[in-house]
Amino acid sequence: MLCQTYPETYAEQFAEKTHRLEQLLGDLPNFDAFASEPEHYRARAEFRVWHEGDQTDYIMFDQQSKEKVAIHHCPMALESIATLMPKLMAHIVQTPVLRQKLFQVDFLATLSGEMLVTLIYRKSLQTKTETGVENDVAWVDAANALRCELPITHIIGRARKQKICLDKDYVIEKLQVDHQTFIYQQIENSFTQPNAEMAQNMLHWARKVAAKANPDQQNDLIELYCGNGHFSIALSDQFHRVLATEISKTSVASAQFNIEANKVDNVTVVKMAAEEISAALQGETFFRLKDIDLSAYAFNTIFVDPPRSGLDDLTRQMVTEFDYIIYISCNPETLAHDLEAIRQTHEVLETALFDQFPYTHHIESGVFLKRKPK
């Protein structure tokens, strides 16, 4: 996809995704289908930069022909990104220190109005000295001027093994869900939900099914692959306590930031892989859990949002030990494979499709399961 949108055919392609999900998963009980906005839905955008004489353009490469295509407007991106793109390029072209050897431009925007721009170069932006590392003063001055002249909250300069951060390397997103505001730190160059409006729908659906799993808020939730705490925080008021695991050090730190920002006091995040927490629940000891008494938790629900490869064998078995399973999937093929095993012990109560990526084959979905009576 080269930034094109096709609003006139969106309803048709959305219906095709629904049909494909039904073919893969079979019956879709209590099915919710969340359509995206047909334009201006992406909060992230990355473009290569091509220099030809006096001309400098954003480009993307056609997946079939591999030819470069100049991008002059991008209706997929949030309005704030789409509006900024030509203005930013005009300033870059007029500023040699910003333009020279510029290789890529990344945009990260929020519904709450913040904008982070990363300029990536094939030249050095820093110099080693006897006292340390010095930033390219001319580049820093030009970048600061750019930030003053355009609606850019933060600017970052990157080169090979170098990073200049003028102030912050993250934005703060505020998502509105069920008459509540959830605050999330979104760090540059790390995973964030690309379709912020759809992220709100996903949180709404997860909260809805969580309330059915734990109507009196007396039981606890365990979450695997929690990232920056996106779901953990939004589900925290649906459970007595939440234990969330994540393997990325950066994501764990961001989750802690978000826990504090949202004034949540019942979520604990630990840096552990899914297979490690599975072993811990079976009695194996881990140093990272030395301050956590797993036996004190009353888990009745597990939340999983695995990578495209789906659940590994150990985790697939582990999830069946819980009364309720909330499974968010970015790959319906691996979800279908996992459900073949999980459906032996659990029944599907509710399903959902979230169109995170319009005009692509990608499908994001949700499944809520309950243990079958013995």
Curated annotation (Swiss-Prot):
One of its GO terms (biological process) is tRNA methylation. Its EC number is 2.1.1.-, 2.1.1.35. Keywords: Methyltransferase, S-adenosyl-L-methionine, Transferase, tRNA processing. One of its GO terms (molecular function) is tRNA (uracil(54)-C5)-methyltransferase activity, S-adenosyl methionine-dependent. PROSITE patterns: SAM_MT_RNA_M5U, TRMA_1, TRMA_2. The keyword S-adenosyl-L-methionine applies. Gene3D superfamilies: 2.40.50.1070, Vaccinia Virus protein VP39 (3.40.50.150). The active site is at C330 (nucleophile), E364 (proton acceptor). This is tRNA/tmRNA (uracil-C(5))-methyltransferase. SUPFAM superfamilies: S-adenosyl-L-methionine-dependent methyltransferases.
